[in-house]
Each structure stands twice: as structure tokens, then as C-alpha cells.
Amino acid sequence: MFLPDWQPITVDLPTEWEFAHLYFVHDLHYGSELFDARKWMRLKDRIISDKYGKVLFIGDLFENAIPGSKSNMFTQTANPAEQKEFVTQQFIDLKEQTIAIVPGNHCSNRTTKTAGLYPLYDCALLAGMGEKYRNIIAFLNIGVGTSKKNKSKQVHYFGQIQHKAKDCKNYGTSDFTDGIDFFAFGHDHNPKETPRSKLVFDKQNNVIYKRNIENIDCGSFCQFGGYGAEAGYRPQSDKMYMLTIFGEEKRMETSGFYLS
């Protein structure tokens, strides 16, 4: 069975790297008639060609429509087995770049709830990445480069990813966990970067300081239409985000880009 969410995923990237690029992939919805294959292939090619690129998968990679779900089973472009085959192949193609995998509601509220199965975990196992899967939340400890202050240590970044999250003005799921440097989520198909901060009382040194947190949602790979259009939702931006973490000193940069 999959490892518990409380077990962090620890990754030590090469000590000679001066930085690493983190890409957040979620809401592909492969199998939906709205899946934007062109957008996905452009991002996939970018990740593969990026020597310093790493990817974190954050749920809803396939549509997985079932009776009673919002999705229309009769307009799917691939059946559930074919959807799993597609996602498994993406995992295989990006195995060396992948740091973590978590599912979304199109797994947990559908196949898992109705049949007790975990289709995205199956994909991870078939791709030889079962140890990178967490069922709701993945906590990350990523080391990169060589610290300027201590040549025997890497610079470490601590992150949290999960598919669904709250992101209100004065309250967010990113506030739940002390010590994280970045938080990434999806589900709402609304790309945005909403950096947060919190005050930290350093009890050991009796000082108070501010800690910054990068808070990122990379939208979706869906074209406009379907039940979103029927419900009167507005079209969402195609913007994507990449987080750069640096290796000599602790520093992060979030950059936005378009793939069209």
C-alpha cells in the first residue's frame, strides 16, 4: 500500500546545481473532451528539455467520469482503462524529473469512494514510482546545490502539495503547516500566485521574524466548455507558474509564463 502522508518525501538534488525549477502539474483531465493536448505537450517538452526541471503532480490527471459525477461519461474521449494507460505513460516519460504525486477529487470522490480503488496509485506503481505517491498531501524536503555558508550542506526547501485547498484573503490551507517555504494546489482551474507570510516567534532566540511562503495554483489543461460553461463560470487564464529554488543561499522566485 502507499506510504502515509506524514512521511515526507526527501530529495537531494545535485550539489553542483545553482538552482532548480519546480513545475506543478494538475488538472489535465485526460479523457475529457475539453483536454488541451497541445498545451500539455508543450509543457511536457519544456520540462524534459529543462536540465534543472523537476515536476510535482497534484491531482486530476484524468477525467474518470462515473455515473452521478458532474462529468459526462458519454463525451469522454477515452475509457477509464485508456485514461490510466495515458497517465502511466506520462509518468514513465517524466520519471527522472518527478518528485511527488498526489491524486485529486476525480479519484477520491469517484473510483476510491465507489469501489475502494486508487487509480493514480496504480499508475505510479506501474511507472515504478510508488514511493513518490501520497494519497492526500505530500510534504517535501528538497535539497539543492551547496550552501555558501556551509560547504558541507545543501540549501533545503520545505513544501506542501495537495489538490484541494482554501485560499481566502485572511485564511488559507498554506497557513496550516509551520515551516514550509512553498505550497502548491489546484482544483479550481484558476491560475494564480498569492504569496503569503506569517510571523514566527523564535523562542530559542527570543526574536520575532517574518516568514514568506510562495503559494501557487497553476490552473488547468482544459479548454472552455462543459459543465463549467453550463454553470456560468468564466473562462480561466492559460497562465502557468514555475518556482525557482536557489542552491547557494535560501531564495525563491516564482515566474509566470504562457505555452501558446
Regions found by a protein language model. Name each.
Residues 26-29, 144-146, 163-165, 219:
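Short, flexible loop/turn elements at secondary-structure junctions
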Residues 134-136, 237:
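Residues that act as N-cap/strand-start positions at coil-to-secondary-structure junctions
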Residues 11-23, 139-159, 210-213:
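Beta-strand-turn-beta hairpins that frame and shape the catalytic cleft
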Residues 158, 162-252, 257:
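Conserved beta-sheet core of the metallophosphoesterase superfamily
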Residues 92-93, 114-128, 151-153, 174-178, ...:
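Short, surface-exposed basic-aromatic patches at helix termini and helix-loop junctions that form
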Residues 1-10:
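Short glycine- and acidic-rich boundary segments immediately preceding or forming the N-terminal edge
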Residues 103-114, 244-260:
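Charge-rich, low-complexity terminal tails
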Residues 9-21, 25-134:
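Core catalytic region of metal-dependent phosphoesterases/phosphodiesterases
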